[in-house]
């Protein structure tokens, strides 16, 4: 990529305007080539404080805007995304390394999220009224106020959108800090909001690294919506330990299990396992990290075909031909981190079946890896965010469930099995927020809640249930005319 193709940042988006930043240089690169893609600035403390100020100033008017009017703005946003569909998909692929086919599905998810969010708000936070003998019992919902959305790099448009849209529909104003790996995607998304006619100050975008994020969280805010690693989520939780009035919605990934039962269609099991482990270069929080297979002929045959399919998998830049199944991990630094994690597992007794290897220097391109950890001693309960699968063998189904539950996390879990009774046993005993049967662990629907238990979250599921953490309930007993009760309580004399 030549220097002429480098995207120069529009700046920070504050109060409906792009303001050229004055902070330290911030850059994003194409992880498939290592070349510079976007250049801008970290938000300064003053810019962050100013964004918070204008979000507060815009709050009252926005919160008092009718739901129908707020929904109209979100639909106008969808129209802008539709107009920029091809550009947005290409930008996602350039900045994350995803194949173009996958980026196109992400753009479709962004578009589809709005109507689902409107429906969810109307179902979960719509006003209700019940008449009693003495008064009207009313339930209404109010926005929290100014909420911070911290974006993730793996779905830079869709995951942030899954917080922003419900927050705006509920009447909150938003301070959005995208992942420092995907600032260009964020700028285009914010431009779509700008072109929708959204009032100034309702959404503000601040680019920056973790230090900018910390400064942002120290402001006068009422909510934080985060998708990312457990380590970062834990730090956010600790940062707000003395501010219980701030609502936190934390989605923090997992060390997800996929159990392979005795199945007739081995190829189907291999296919769904690949979609569970390797899609998005293993960079989905619902990716299966641990594949639990029977210690039998079925298990041997499955593992042989799984390894062969991973070895033959096409990996490369999004514009490669023929089209790849996966691209790189998000950066060269992360690729080296994952390779180091693989080395540590080998030192613990893991047996390499297919080594994960760096395919091109100075990039995030790595090949899929498979390691058998059955005989390893005390394997770490950590999420390796890469195309890398750990194999564990079991002798009976009860043992498979026991192995699956050996994690402090609890986001997703899956079972590939022709046995309905085994699925019922699996479902009843597995502790996870998403439990799939004969579907990839990465399979999820925006019409359902999305979240985990344990160290995977703090019981604030997103997707269809995002409306729940974007507004708080207000219960009211109301009577239009002040009257004295006919029957008064004993012991009171009114003259």
Swiss-Prot record:
Task: Keyword check for DNA-binding, yes or no.
Answer: no
Q: Write out the catalytic residues in the record.
A: 251, 285
Please state the pathway this protein functions in, per its UniProt record: Amino-acid degradation; L-arginine degradation via AST pathway; L-glutamate and succinate from L-arginine: step 4/5
Please indicate if the UniProt record lists Oxidoreductase as a keyword.
yes
One of this protein's Pfam families, by short name? Aldedh
Which GO BP terms sit in this record?
arginine catabolic process to glutamate; arginine catabolic process to succinate; proline catabolic process to glutamate
**Reaction catalysed?**
N-succinyl-L-glutamate 5-semialdehyde + NAD(+) + H2O = N-succinyl-L-glutamate + NADH + 2 H(+)
- Extract one GO cellular component term from the record: cytoplasmic side of plasma membrane
Give the main EC class. oxidoreductase
**Do you know which Gene3D superfamilies this protein is assigned to?**
Aldehyde Dehydrogenase, Chain A, domain 1 (3.40.605.10), Aldehyde Dehydrogenase, Chain A, domain 2 (3.40.309.10)
Function text? Catalyzes the NAD-dependent reduction of succinylglutamate semialdehyde into succinylglutamate.
- What name does UniProt use for this protein? N-succinylglutamate 5-semialdehyde dehydrogenase
């Amino acid at each position: 990529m030549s220097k002429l193709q480098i995207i120069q940042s529009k700046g920070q988006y504050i109060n409906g305007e792009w303001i050229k930043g004055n902070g330290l240089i911030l850059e994003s690169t194409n992880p498939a080539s290592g070349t510079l893609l976007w250049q801008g600035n970290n938000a300064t403390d003053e810019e962050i404080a100013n964004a918070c100020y204008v979000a507060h100033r815009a709050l009252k008017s926005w919160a008092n805007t009718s739901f129908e009017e707020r929904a109209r703005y979100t639909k106008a946003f969808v129209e802008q995304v539709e107009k920029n569909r091809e550009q947005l998909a290409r930008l996602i692929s350039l900045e994350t390394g995803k194949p173009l086919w996958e980026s196109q599905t992400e753009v479709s998810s962004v578009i589809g999220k709005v109507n689902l969010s409107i429906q969810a708000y109307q179902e979960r936070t719509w006003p209700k009224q019940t008449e009693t003998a003495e008064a009207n019992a009313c339930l209404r919902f109010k926005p929290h106020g100014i909420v911070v959305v911290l974006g993730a790099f793996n779905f830079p448009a869709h995951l942030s959108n899954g917080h922003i849209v419900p927050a705006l529909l509920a009447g909150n104003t938003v301070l959005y800090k995208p992942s420092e790996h995907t600032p260009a995607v964020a700028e285009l998304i914010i431009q779509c909001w700008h072109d929708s006619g959204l009032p100034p100050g309702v959404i503000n975008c601040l680019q920056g690294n973790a230090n900018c994020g910390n400064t942002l969280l120290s402001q006068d805010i009422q909510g934080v919506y985060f998708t990312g690693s457990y380590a970062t989520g834990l730090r956010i939780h600790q940062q707000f330990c003395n501010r219980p009035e701030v609502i936190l919605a934390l989605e923090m990934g997992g060390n997800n299990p996929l159990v392979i039962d005795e199945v007739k269609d081995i190829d189907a099991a291999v296919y769904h396992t690949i979609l569970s482990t390797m899609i998005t270069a293993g960079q989905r929080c619902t990716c299966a990290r641990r594949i639990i297979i029977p210690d039998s002929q079925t298990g041997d045959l499955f593992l042989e075909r799984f390894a062969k399919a991973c070895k033959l998998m096409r990996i490369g830049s999004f514009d490669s031909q023929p089209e790849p199944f996966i691209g790189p991990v998000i950066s060269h630094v992360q690729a080296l981190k994952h390779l180091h994690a693989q080395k540590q597992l080998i030192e613990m007794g893991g047996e390499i079946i297919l080594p994960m290897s760096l395919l091109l220097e100075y990039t995030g391109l790595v090949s899929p890896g498979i390691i058998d950890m059955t005989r390893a001693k005390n394997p770490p309960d950590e999420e390796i965010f890469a195309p890398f699968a750990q194999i564990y063998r079991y002798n009976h189904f009860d043992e498979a469930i026991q192995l699956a539950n050996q994690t402090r996390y609890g986001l997703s879990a899956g079972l590939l099995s022709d046995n309905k009774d085994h699925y019922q046993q699996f479902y009843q005993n597995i502790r996870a927020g998403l439990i799939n049967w004969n579907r990839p662990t990465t399979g999820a629907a925006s019409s359902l809640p999305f979240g985990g238990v344990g160290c995977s979250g703090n019981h604030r599921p997103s997707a269809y249930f995002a409306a729940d953490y974007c507004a708080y309930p207000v219960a009211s007993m109301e009577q239009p005319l002040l009257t004295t009760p006919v029957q008064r309580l004993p012991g009171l004399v009114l003259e």
